[in-house]
Amino acid sequence: MEESMKQASVMENLRSVVFKESESLEGTCAKIRGYDFNNGIDYSQILKSMVSTGFQASNLGDAIETVNQMLDWRLSHEQVTEDCSQEEKNPTYRESIKCKIFLGFTSNLISSGVRDIIRYLVQHHMVDVIVTTTGGIEEDLIKCLADTFKGEFSLPGAELRSKGLNRIGNLLVPNDNYCKFEDWIIPIFDQMLEEQKAKNVLWTPSKLIMRLGKEINNESSYLYWAYKNDIPVFCPGLTDGSLGDMLYFHTFRNPGLIVDVVQDIRAINSEAVHANPRKTGMIILGGGLPKHHICNANMMRNGADYAVFINTAQEFDGSDSGARPDEAVSWGKIRGSAKSVKVHCDATIAFPLLVAETFAAKREQSAEPSS
């Protein structure tokens, strides 16, 4: 009898540990459900189902929702404050004020087919400020002069070098492409130097980039559309790439060209500081310089209101590339009240899907005739 009571006590203790009573999640958390293909193939609904799928699919779904919030926001959604200007009290004006979107990306994405998606966004003026690396400038221009090809990640470097082929992941860029780039760009540098001397033009990286977008005059180029739509493109590391090589070569041929980075740091910080009364949103593909430059500019206004990071970097080495949005909150680069998410995914996979369900979907909806 005593042994039986002991067994019952043990079982009761085990049950209390193993079957601990749960706090109800009904109404507070989304239920995990995937897409049901019995409903047919509906790509928009498949993307909408990501948010309830789990893991990085849910992060992608959250990113889609965050970008749509950026695109939907209007000043009219906010309460009128006592200290706002008369113009800001006007309902028509308030409805016209949209979120200011900063787009950042690394050069490899311009080497890839994501270039065409970025060109689409810039062509239709869907973003307001761009930050990229030098490769993100030169690769766009070079693709107007010659093609990039699909290769393999495993191709041996020594063999490729002997053939004059450069590998970017599983992409191949013939070395001849850079020769064509040199032939195209050096005369432009000559013209810029002449204008510097004759007209006292003080070039900055963003002014130089705008000039290159004008000179390339090619609708496949996102820089061309940035020039056409007056969207600033910032590149603080302008010398770190083939473009830097060309500037270096130009110093031997025709020395004296000056490019001032100080004007540009004032310009990009001003883009954030003077954004008010607009909210600001950040969409950053990859890490490094573009990620930090955009975040740091938004720190000047006490943080961005929306943030979407898409990259595969980890935070455990303390790198800015791998840092989650919450780390940026600690620096004041993202507001504590902001809607933010990081998608741990190759941007060549995630970004086209995100654009399809945000920017492109809204543009398509606006083009549909009203019934």
Swiss-Prot record:
Keywords: Hypusine biosynthesis, NAD, Transferase. Spermidine binds at residues 138-139, 245, 292, 318-320, 327-333. Its EC number is 2.5.1.46. The keyword Protein transport does not apply. Its cofactor is NAD(+). It is an enzyme of class 2 (transferase). Pathway: Protein modification; eIF5A hypusination. The active site is at residue 333. GO terms for cellular component: cytoplasm. Expressed in shoot tips. It catalyses: [eIF5A protein]-L-lysine + spermidine = [eIF5A protein]-deoxyhypusine + propane-1,3-diamine. NAD(+) binds at residues 107-111, 133-135, 139, 240, 287, 312-313, 346-347. GO terms for molecular function: deoxyhypusine synthase activity. It comes from the Eukaryota. Belongs to the deoxyhypusine synthase family. NCBIfam families: dhys. Catalyzes the NAD-dependent oxidative cleavage of spermidine and the subsequent transfer of the butylamine moiety of spermidine to the epsilon-amino group of a specific lysine residue of the eIF-5A precursor protein to form the intermediate deoxyhypusine residue. Also able to produce homospermidine from putrescine. This is Deoxyhypusine synthase. It comes from Senecio vernalis.
